Amino acid sequence: MDLENVSCPICLRKFDNLQALNAHLDVEHGFNDNEDSLGSNDSRLVNGKQKKARSVDSSAQKLKRSHWEKFKKGKSCCHTCGRTLNNNIGAINCRKCGKLYCRRHLPNMIKLNLSAQYDPRNGKWYNCCHDCFVTKPGYNDYGEVIDLTPEFFKVRNIKREDKNLRLLQLENRFVRLVDGLITLYNTYSRSIIHNLKMNSEMSKLERTVTPWRDDRSVLFCNICSEPFGLLLRKHHCRLCGMVVCDDANRNCSNEISIGYLMSAASDLPFEYNIQKDDLLHIPISIRLCSHCIDMLFIGRKFNKDVRMPLSGIFAKYDSMQNISKVIDSLLPIFEDSLNSLKVETAKDSENTLDPKNLNDLARLRHKLLNSFNLYNTLTRQLLSVEPQSHLERQLQNSIKIASAAYINEKILPLKSLPAILNPEGHKTNEDGQKAEPEVKKLSQLMIENLTIKEVKELREELMVLKEQSYLIESTIQDYKKQRRLEEIVTLNKNLEELHSRIHTVQSKLGDHGFN
């Protein structure tokens, strides 16, 4: 018998001799955990010689192993990754909880006493799993916390104050410049000779509003950094005095009519009123750099856009979104109730159904169909709005496709609705009072003719389906002109589903349908 190359029968690890194997079984797999085996000093015969079994220490110094999970070849799995444990990936017990893990998922070390309990002061370091590591006392319980919020507030307030001061400075310069230019225009615009003097006075006023930077030392535009030359002239911003270029492609500076500037900043305290004094078409322009334009007018434009009412397209789309939220909230409730009803009828089809549940489901279905009809009406109204730009036309097409896909997706679950969800109306008894609704069996309800309520709801559904079919067909025609073939394939599939559903509804209606 070869006693030199032996393998562990549990984890298949190879050892040079039996002594190493016995020590491995005692330490790693807990075969020497009993008191008898821990205190035994029986000798073993190895290669014809007596040798004492190797032990980690005396029995009083060994870690508790009775709680360790026993290894079963081909059955034991790692509690973290779930892989079957073998010699390649290892089979190691967590010293704390005793569960088996592979070598990869037992990387942590904790201090334990001989009873396998947490002992950070007097314990020794042992391998443990991630769960035992993170659940030890004191793990991530506390730490140094430095609240930097006041510092961030301070920095933000400084930057905000600087920006507000800069904006206030530009606004004061702008008001002073506009009022001065209008005053000069009203004074000198009556004769040609006075016009020559007016230009000189305006130039002096512009230089007094803000100091201009010496353009002789400036070789590059302060915004786009392009070098000045014969084709790229130097200009001064009338509010900040910075030297910029006049390239139309880069928009570093622009000459803007004073009337449009006043209308864009109508909240400023100008001396003149643009409407009363008829200043909208006054022939005076002011050159401003892009930085000053952004600081003065972007915030005002944003606030103005927020206060403005939504355009026709966006108003209709907002209403469509509100209806879709109602549909999304009602549809799961309806489907859950319908599924529970199907489960009840599947158990025993001869049982009578609760009339209260039937009425609730019929009411939910009626709400859903009305919501779909309203959603479809809003879609038609949105498409009838004349777009004001190419962007709005693109938005209309996108909304048309999205609404068709939405209704096609949401309304199809209603096609499986059985006739039991439309109970007959309450009947009156002989005394003239309303009696309880008649409860029928499922087999009886499925073979009867359609009621007036069913015909009405099927007609509403058919109307919605035909409208969606028309929308998709028109979209397909538009996409054929634009050669968007990939999207046409998807739309054709949706159209086939709609036609199939339309045919089903029409077959149910029969003579009660309409063309």
Swiss-Prot record:
Regions crossing the membrane: none
GO cellular component assignments: cytoplasm; cytoplasmic side of endosome membrane; cytosol; nucleus; vacuolar membrane
Ranges for region Disordered: 36-58
InterPro entries assigned to the protein according to its UniProt record, in alphabetical order: Rab4/Rab5_effector, Rbsn_Rab-bd, Rbsn_Rab-bd_sf, Znf_C2H2_type, Znf_FYVE, Znf_FYVE-rel, Znf_FYVE_PHD, Znf_RING/FYVE/PHD
Stored PROSITE patterns: ZF_FYVE (PS50178), ZINC_FINGER_C2H2_1 (PS00028)
Membrane topology summary: Peripheral membrane protein
Protein name: Vacuolar segregation protein PEP7
Organism of derivation: Saccharomyces cerevisiae (strain ATCC 204508 / S288c) (Baker's yeast)
